[in-house]
Amino acid sequence: MQRWTLWAAAFLTLHSAQAFPQTDISISPALPELPLPSLCPLFWMEFKGHCYRFFPLNKTWAEADLYCSEFSVGRKSAKLASIHSWEENVFVYDLVNSCVPGIPADVWTGLHDHRQEGQFEWTDGSSYDYSYWDGSQPDDGVHADPEEEDCVQIWYRPTSALRSWNDNTCSRKFPFVCKIPSLTIH
């Protein structure tokens, strides 16, 4: 019986080498490499390396900015949201709409021209490289009396483009969206 086992093993070894010729096989990962995960605080939503949160609290622009600064990730404090692309503008508006579906909401952003009229800047210090003003905006409150309009909101008007921007009086009270860089795990 032992001879039979040795003979069968030798036979299978020789024939399997002929039946299945050796080839170079390279194995690639089944899944593509994923980007590094990022972390946002609880109840915040991530979009392209930043965390966002809608607050349905009616506050003046300054109160909203101060409220945002109370939240932090690492050493960074949140600010009223800055917006740098159409996609980000849509994300912010849709974030608001997902929290208050079907209810039109005007929301504060971090854009303002407090220092010099017509020279807009973001509260987080990022560049003013994108805008989506409504047709007649910014108008610095041509119709407002007596206050100027130095703070910017995403507004909803049935006659305006969805997600368009308007400069408004900073003392008006609206809900707002805060933004902060997300933590990246290395």
Curated annotation (Swiss-Prot):
Entry keywords, A to Z: Disulfide bond, Glycoprotein, Lectin, Secreted, Signal
Disulphide linkage map: 68-178, 151-170
Signal peptide bounds: 1-19
Annotated glycan sites: 58
GO CC annotation: extracellular region
Keyword Ubl conjugation found: no
Residue ranges occupied by any C-type lectin domain in the UniProt entry: 47-179
Family matches, as InterPro entries: C-type_lectin-like (IPR001304), C-type_lectin-like/link_sf (IPR016186), C-type_lectin/snaclec_domain (IPR050111), C-type_lectin_CS (IPR018378), CEL1-like_CTLD (IPR033988), CTDL_fold (IPR016187)
Molecular function GO terms recorded: carbohydrate binding
Keyword Cell membrane: no
Localization per Swiss-Prot or TrEMBL: Secreted
SUPFAM superfamilies: C-type lectin-like (SSF56436)
Protein name listed in UniProt: C-type lectin domain family 19 member A
Lineage: Eukaryota, Metazoa, Chordata, Craniata, Vertebrata
Gene from which the chain derives: CLEC19A
